[in-house]
Each structure stands twice: as structure tokens, then as C-alpha cells.
Amino acid sequence: MKKSSVKKRGILCSVLSLLISGYSLYRYFSKLRFEEVAIERSTDNCEDNCLSVSLNYLRCKGNSEFAQNFNKEIETQVANFLLSNEDTLQVDVSIEKALESFMSDYNNIHEHFPEIPAYELILSDSIMWQNSKMLTLVSNRYSFTGGANAVQSKVFTHFALDNGEVITNENLFTDEAKVTAIAEKYFKQTQEASVIEVLDDKGFGFDGNGFHLPKSMGISADYLILFYEPFEIASYMDAAFEVKVPMKEVMPYLTFKED
């Protein structure tokens, strides 16, 4: 048999293997189904200045490895959002138990200090982006549990579609240094168009540590979204700061990009 024929057969086999593998992945991912879970709670027999909790999160249907890991992570995140006033994170408490604890704590405080303003928690989750290897979920959150100001935040979570494991920031990109350099440019552009003051020699508002990526980073179709909590930039900041980096510039370094 000629070498060219063997080579062609090898290429054909490789192509068929990729097609079969791709079709199998498509069938698996197309079977993933999500449902929205909505929970609304308020203080019983309350007419004015009432505690309010609004939760909208996703649950993956079925019993696949992805569904089990995804649902466990979401359960943990929502429960800890409800228990955000506690000192330590919980990993084995249900959302219902956490909700009962939150409302009970508020009712106990309100009983002794009826003049306190009503607490309010809002959480809304949605899938922001997905390819054949991963998906990004965004959780928009609002929390007022006393104090001077309410807290608004975004939490992005990335899931590997083959098993539902969380993709950490450290594993999100193949070259974090290059992504950081690209992000730094867009941070500066966004900063110059905002009211953030210049604090250090590089022209950024970081407290002596230099520019760095935030803890919360989200992927959308068009942008890598960098969501900086106030304390991540400077101690004097009282509001979050969002930077959008064109996805086309960082896509080459995405660990879970399409083949």
C-alpha cells in the first residue's frame, strides 16, 4: 500500500474520530436542562418596613455528574449568601436551613430593637455564556443587613461542562500574565473615564500592590468582565468598579476555548 494512501486513511480516521467525539459532546451538552428556583419570603403579618428575601437561582435537572456538582455548588453559594453575617463559610447547610436561620436572627434582633430598618436580600442567577467545554454563571446580589449602606455585588462562577467542577481563576487562562497585561490597559482606559482618583505612580488606585486581576471575573460573548470590589482597589473606595476587556483579545489564552 502506498504511503500516501495510508496517510489519507489516517487523516480520515482522525477526522471521523473528531466528528464522533464532537457529536457525543453535543448530545451530552444538549441534554443539560436547567430550571429556575424562585423563593420569596417576608416577615409574617408585617405591613411596613418588612424583612424581604428574594432568591432566584438555577438547578440542573437529572442525576449526572455535572448536575450533582453544579447543584451542590449553587446550594453552597446561596446558603452562604444568606449567612453572610456569620464569621465562617458553611458547606453542609441547606438553603432552607440558612433561610430559616437568617429570618430567625433578624426576628430576634427586631424584637429587642424594633426601630432597626428591615433587612433585604436579593439574589438572581443566570447563565451568561457557554461553549462546548464550559459555562459562566453570573449571580447578581443585593444585601442590606443594617449599617450605612447596602452592598451590591456580582459573583461569577465557571463550570467545566464535562463534570460540573468549578474552574478557578488560576485555571481559567493558560497565560495569566498576558491576560493581566491586556486587562491593565483597559482598566486604565476605564479609570480615565471615571471619577477614580490616581493614587500610585502607575496611575491606578491600588494600595501599593500594583495592578492585579479581581477575584470576580466573568466571560460573556463579547467581553471578559472584571468586577472589582471596593477593597480590591483602595481602602477609600465605596463602590464596585467594572472593567470590560474585549473577549477577542484574551480568547487565545482561555483554557477551555473551543478546539
Sequence positions of predicted segments:
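Short, Lys/Arg-rich N-terminal segment immediately upstream of the first membrane anchor
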Residues: 1-6
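Compositionally biased intrinsically disordered regions enriched in Thr/Gly
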Residues: 7-259
